[in-house]
Amino acid sequence: MAHKKAGGSSRNGRDSKGQRLGCKKFGGETVKAGNIIYRQRGTQIHPGNNVGCGKDYTLFALIEGIVTFERMGRDRKKVSVYPN
Protein backbone atom coordinates (compact mmCIF):
# COMPACT_ATOMS: atom_id res chain seq x y z
CA MET A 1 0.00 0.00 0.00
CA ALA A 2 1.37 3.37 -0.99
CA HIS A 3 1.15 6.00 1.69
CA LYS A 4 1.53 8.92 -0.71
CA LYS A 5 -1.20 9.82 -3.18
CA ALA A 6 -0.03 10.05 -6.79
CA GLY A 7 1.02 13.59 -7.69
CA GLY A 8 -1.19 15.87 -9.73
CA SER A 9 -4.64 14.62 -8.71
CA SER A 10 -6.68 17.29 -6.97
CA ARG A 11 -10.21 16.75 -5.61
CA ASN A 12 -11.22 20.32 -4.76
CA GLY A 13 -10.62 22.45 -7.84
CA ARG A 14 -14.10 23.35 -9.13
CA ASP A 15 -16.58 26.13 -8.52
CA SER A 16 -19.63 27.31 -10.44
CA LYS A 17 -19.93 30.85 -11.73
CA GLY A 18 -22.38 33.26 -10.11
CA GLN A 19 -25.70 33.69 -11.92
CA ARG A 20 -25.82 37.51 -11.83
CA LEU A 21 -29.24 37.59 -10.16
CA GLY A 22 -30.75 40.54 -8.30
CA CYS A 23 -31.87 44.09 -8.87
CA LYS A 24 -30.77 45.72 -12.14
CA LYS A 25 -32.78 48.95 -11.83
CA PHE A 26 -33.54 50.50 -8.43
CA GLY A 27 -36.50 52.53 -7.20
CA GLY A 28 -36.62 56.02 -8.71
CA GLU A 29 -34.59 55.08 -11.79
CA THR A 30 -35.94 55.78 -15.27
CA VAL A 31 -36.40 52.77 -17.57
CA LYS A 32 -37.34 52.24 -21.19
CA ALA A 33 -39.74 49.54 -22.41
CA GLY A 34 -37.95 46.18 -22.37
CA ASN A 35 -35.37 47.10 -19.73
CA ILE A 36 -34.71 44.34 -17.19
CA ILE A 37 -35.58 45.46 -13.67
CA TYR A 38 -35.03 42.31 -11.57
CA ARG A 39 -33.54 38.85 -12.23
CA GLN A 40 -34.65 36.14 -9.81
CA ARG A 41 -35.36 32.44 -9.27
CA GLY A 42 -39.07 32.20 -8.48
CA THR A 43 -41.17 35.22 -7.56
CA GLN A 44 -39.29 36.94 -4.75
CA ILE A 45 -40.77 40.13 -6.19
CA HIS A 46 -44.05 40.09 -8.13
CA PRO A 47 -44.80 42.10 -11.28
CA GLY A 48 -46.99 45.16 -10.70
CA ASN A 49 -48.31 47.84 -13.04
CA ASN A 50 -46.61 48.00 -16.45
CA VAL A 51 -44.15 45.21 -15.56
CA GLY A 52 -43.92 41.89 -17.41
CA CYS A 53 -42.61 38.54 -16.14
CA GLY A 54 -40.47 36.26 -18.32
CA LYS A 55 -40.49 32.46 -18.19
CA ASP A 56 -37.42 32.55 -15.92
CA TYR A 57 -39.24 35.06 -13.63
CA THR A 58 -37.21 38.03 -14.93
CA LEU A 59 -39.16 41.26 -14.41
CA PHE A 60 -39.00 43.83 -17.22
CA ALA A 61 -40.57 47.19 -18.02
CA LEU A 62 -43.48 47.30 -20.48
CA ILE A 63 -43.48 51.11 -20.82
CA GLU A 64 -41.03 53.96 -20.35
CA GLY A 65 -41.24 55.43 -16.86
CA ILE A 66 -39.98 55.39 -13.27
CA VAL A 67 -39.44 52.21 -11.22
CA THR A 68 -41.17 51.92 -7.83
CA PHE A 69 -41.00 49.02 -5.38
CA GLU A 70 -44.21 48.55 -3.36
CA ARG A 71 -45.60 46.18 -0.74
CA MET A 72 -48.47 43.76 -1.33
CA GLY A 73 -49.80 43.02 2.14
CA ARG A 74 -47.35 42.14 4.88
CA ASP A 75 -45.05 39.67 3.22
CA ARG A 76 -45.00 40.32 -0.53
CA LYS A 77 -43.31 42.94 -2.68
CA LYS A 78 -44.07 44.10 -6.19
CA VAL A 79 -42.36 46.37 -8.66
CA SER A 80 -44.26 48.77 -10.91
CA VAL A 81 -43.34 51.28 -13.60
CA TYR A 82 -45.26 54.56 -13.76
CA PRO A 83 -45.05 57.01 -16.67
CA ASN A 84 -43.12 60.19 -15.86
Curated annotation (Swiss-Prot):
Keywords: Ribonucleoprotein, Ribosomal protein
A GO CC term attached to the entry: cytosolic large ribosomal subunit
ATP-binding found in the keyword field: no
Ribosomal protein found in the keyword field: yes
Coiled coil: none
Organism in which the protein naturally occurs: Pelobacter propionicus (strain DSM 2379 / NBRC 103807 / OttBd1)
PROSITE patterns according to UniProt: RIBOSOMAL_L27 (PS00831)
Gene behind this protein: rpmA
Biological process annotations from GO: translation
Molecular functions (GO terms): structural constituent of ribosome
HAMAP family, A to Z: Ribosomal_bL27
Region called Disordered, residue ranges: 1-24
Source superkingdom: Bacteria
Family statement: Belongs to the bacterial ribosomal protein bL27 family.
Record-linked InterPro entries: Ribosomal_bL27, Ribosomal_bL27_CS
Name of this protein: Large ribosomal subunit protein bL27
Record Gene3D superfamilies: 2.40.50.100
NCBIfam families per UniProt: L27
